[in-house]
């Protein structure tokens, strides 16, 4: 569920931030609205997706990797709806703060339910970000947003053929309002590139695969208490 998004502003890009930031709070898609907080890493809610001015995209995973591939599957859900180029995405791990989950929930990873539990809000988050980038493209070229498409980290005006990388649009997108939940348009299943697509999980796309298969990965079981 999106909470009060129509009254929130997208985090404004600045030299300190270099892009815009999406967040998750209380199990809902939200946005950070303080540049000062962004610069210091102190947020009311967890950092979720960052798109930088160079187009590089950082997705935060709030579930724990235990060899099941959750650090690939969950960020790929966001990337799919965002129409992001996976090769330009990186994944960082969330901390253990309760801000990542609804009140009364545990920030745990168990029962093979991470995707089932999070897929709806992750899809919504990615789709909302994509729509804002499309709106930014429409504003940049002064054309109707209905003439704008997005694919593979690029926004295109179909009639003129003009295009812009996501990184070129973060400044404009930072001044736009977040779409209401009822207006967020997620992809049809037939349009999925990563979700439910086994071919997307090739070794080169799998986060941490080399570390997991060579024994370099660090897990909770590796912790030795003094």
Walk through the language-model features, giving the residues of each.
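Cofactor-binding beta-sheet edge motifs in enzyme active sites
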Residues: 2-23, 32-226
């Amino acid at each position: 569920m999106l909470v009060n998004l129509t009254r929130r502003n997208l985090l404004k890009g600045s030299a300190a931030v270099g892009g815009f930031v999406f967040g998750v709070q209380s199990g809902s898609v939200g946005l950070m609205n303080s540049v000062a907080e962004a610069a210091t890493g102190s947020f009311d809610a967890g950092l979720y997706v960052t798109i930088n001015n160079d187009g590089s995209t950082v997705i935060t995973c709030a579930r724990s990797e235990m060899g099941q591939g959750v650090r690939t599957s969950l960020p790929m859900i966001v990337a799919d709806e965002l129409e992001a180029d996976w090769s330009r995405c990186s994944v960082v791990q969330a901390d253990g703060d309760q801000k990542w989950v609804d009140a009364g929930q545990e920030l745990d990873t168990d029962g093979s339910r991470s995707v089932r539990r999070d897929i709806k809000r992750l899809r919504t988050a990615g789709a909302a970000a994509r729509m804002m980038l499309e709106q930014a493209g429409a504003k940049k070229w002064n054309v109707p947003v209905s003439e704008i498409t997005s694919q593979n980290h690029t926004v295109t005006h179909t009639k003129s053929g003009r295009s812009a990388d996501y990184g070129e649009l973060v400044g404009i997108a930072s001044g736009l309002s977040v779409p209401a939940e009822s207006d967020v348009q997620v992809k049809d299943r037939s349009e999925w590139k990563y979700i439910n697509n086994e071919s997307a999980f090739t070794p080169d796309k799998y986060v941490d695969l080399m570390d997991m298969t060579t024994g370099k990965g660090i897990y909770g079981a590796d912790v030795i208490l003094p």
